[in-house]
Regions:
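Hydrophobic alpha-helical scaffolding
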Residues: 15, 148, 173, 192-195, ...
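Short, acidic/polar
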Residues: 18-28, 95-104, 150-156
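Active-site beta->alpha loop and helix N-cap motifs at the rims of alpha/beta catalytic domains
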Residues: 30, 36-122
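Short, structured segments at the rim of ligand-binding sites
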Residues: 14, 18-21, 29-32, 40-41, ...
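Catalytic alpha/beta core domains of metabolic enzymes, predominantly
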Residues: 119-246
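N-terminal small/glycine-rich loop or linker at the start of catalytic domains
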Residues: 1-18, 88-90, 130-139
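Terminal or standalone catalytic/regulatory effector modules within metabolic enzymes
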Residues: 6, 28-63, 252-327
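Active-site pocket-lining/capping segments in soluble small-molecule metabolic enzymes
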Residues: 4-6, 55, 60-64, 68, ...
Length: 327
């Protein structure tokens, strides 16, 4: 069974976290079929040991002897343990050649591998395939780093090739890691992961994350950005409206988003007709005239034309028509 463990909370040590938001974040992870979540001792103390049920709890704990202080935690990560019992040994891997050392690993040793950020950028495909084969044989929890901007791809490919594999990720990839939401959707699209489950709660997870960190996720962030389904280009709009699957690997509703046609300097007649249809006015206004007005305003303001501005243009067209009729 594929397992995804989210370690976002370990990356928020410097933020003024609130218990209610952390609890809500964990509950939302569980609703998204995330297998487990990782805490630090500080976050555990903030939660007062009151951990939501339904997911497996892990903790980053350098000293294994202190594990008795944290009831409710199922497993502990440490670089100073043998990987047996309740402990998972953390190993940093900086080069694919170091994976050969995993061949001597005993079956009862639990491992987590961090690093491997350059696994996908080798010129030889054979090197990558040998590395992936060694990973599958050892079956560690894979926690790739994102220095080469391919951690999410490495994590997803590991799960695609190893259907009993486990990866560790963070929301939006915070902390230079693979992004939880990207790995979930990659597995949904490629492997039909949880085919009967909706991931619309990802939008809720985004909102909770923003509240916890007092930040705003950029609009075009993959999977969870608010603007990833905003379309402007005339040809693009025409194609998406005719057959969305040609342009979108998953429907916006799957992740709690919605598609929106944006008016701007790259718009075409299809965009204008689409907007007019939204207002049930598709046969009432000259499309080419409105399109010219939209492009002029977009260039002038250096951005998109809002719905309010478009309605103003429609009113101006009405005034123009009345003036011509009276002249």
């Amino acid at each position: 069974m594929i397992k995804i463990i989210d370690a976002t909370l370990t990356m928020l040590e410097e933020y003024p976290l609130k218990k209610e938001l952390v609890y809500e974040f964990a509950r939302t992870l569980e609703s998204l079929c995330i297998w487990g979540a990782v805490l630090t001792p500080r976050v555990y103390q903030l939660m007062e040991g009151d951990l939501p049920q339904g997911i497996t709890w892990y903790m980053e704990l350098p000293s294994p002897s202190e594990s008795v202080k944290y009831p409710g935690i199922h497993l502990f990560f440490s670089s100073f343990c043998d990987g047996t019992g309740k402990y998972i040994r953390n190993i940093q891997v900086n080069d694919v050649s170091e994976l050969r050392g995993l061949e001597c690993t005993r079956p009862d040793n639990r491992l987590r591998l961090t690093g491997l950020d350059d696994l996908l950028i080798y010129e030889s495909r054979d090197i990558y395939e040998r590395g992936m084969k060694l990973l599958i044989q050892a079956s560690p929890i894979l926690y790739p780093e994102n220095s080469c901007y391919c951690a999410s791809a490495i994590a997803a490919d590991y799960l695609q090739n190893h259907h009993n594999g486990t990866v560790m990720t963070t929301f939006t990839g915070i902390g230079n890691k693979a992004a939880t939401e990207q790995v979930i959707l990659a597995m949904r699209v490629v492997e039909r992961y949880k085919p009967n489950n909706s991931f619309e709660k990802l939008a809720d997870l985004r909102n909770i994350f923003e509240a916890m960190t007092n930040t705003q996720i950029p609009g075009h962030t993959p999977v969870v950005g608010r603007k990833i389904f905003y379309i402007e280009s005339g040809l693009h709009v025409d194609g998406v409206l005719k057959k969305p699957s040609n342009y979108e690997s998953f429907p916006p509703e799957l992740v709690g988003a919605s598609r929106k046609v944006i008016l701007g300097k790259h718009s075409g007649g299809t965009s204008i007709r689409y907007k007019l249809k939204q207002y049930q006015m598709e046969d009432c206004y000259p499309v080419e005239h409105l399109l010219e007005m939209v492009k002029r305003l977009s260039i002038k303001k250096g951005g998109e034309v809002t719905d309010e501005e478009f309605l103003t243009m429609m009113s101006e067209c009405d005034k123009y028509e009345k003036a011509n009729q009276n002249s």
